[in-house]
Amino acid sequence: MLTLKVFVYTVVTFFVFLFIFGFLSNDPARNPGKGNLD
């Protein structure tokens, strides 16, 4: 099932990208004094 494998890799890569992007955007060292916007 090549289609299933491609789908799984796409979803995993997407969630990893969201996790890394969210971690960097919420890093206090990169945004001092801002805190969480939630």
Swiss-Prot record:
<keyword id="KW-1133">Transmembrane helix</keyword>
<keyword id="KW-0674">Reaction center</keyword>
<keyword id="KW-0812">Transmembrane</keyword>
<dbReference type="GO" id="GO:0015979">
    <property type="term" value="P:photosynthesis"/>
</dbReference>
<keyword id="KW-0604">Photosystem II</keyword>
<comment type="subunit">
    <text>PSII is composed of 1 copy each of membrane proteins PsbA, PsbB, PsbC, PsbD, PsbE, PsbF, PsbH, PsbI, PsbJ, PsbK, PsbL, PsbM, PsbT, PsbX, PsbY, PsbZ, Psb30/Ycf12, at least 3 peripheral proteins of the oxygen-evolving complex and a large number of cofactors. It forms dimeric complexes.</text>
</comment>
<keyword id="KW-0602">Photosynthesis</keyword>
<protein>
    <recommendedName>
        <fullName>Photosystem II reaction center protein I</fullName>
    </recommendedName>
</protein>
<keyword id="KW-0934">Plastid</keyword>
<comment type="similarity">
    <text>Belongs to the PsbI family.</text>
</comment>
<dbReference type="Pfam" id="PF02532">
    <property type="entry name" value="PsbI"/>
</dbReference>
<comment type="function">
    <text>One of the components of the core complex of photosystem II (PSII), required for its stability and/or assembly. PSII is a light-driven water:plastoquinone oxidoreductase that uses light energy to abstract electrons from H(2)O, generating O(2) and a proton gradient subsequently used for ATP formation. It consists of a core antenna complex that captures photons, and an electron transfer chain that converts photonic excitation into a charge separation.</text>
</comment>
<dbReference type="GO" id="GO:0009539">
    <property type="term" value="C:photosystem II reaction center"/>
</dbReference>
<feature type="transmembrane region" description="Helical">
    <location>
        <begin position="4"/>
        <end position="24"/>
    </location>
</feature>
<dbReference type="GO" id="GO:0009535">
    <property type="term" value="C:chloroplast thylakoid membrane"/>
</dbReference>
<dbReference type="InterPro" id="IPR003686">
    <property type="entry name" value="PSII_PsbI"/>
</dbReference>
<keyword id="KW-0472">Membrane</keyword>
<keyword id="KW-0793">Thylakoid</keyword>
<keyword id="KW-0150">Chloroplast</keyword>
<dbReference type="InterPro" id="IPR037271">
    <property type="entry name" value="PSII_PsbI_sf"/>
</dbReference>
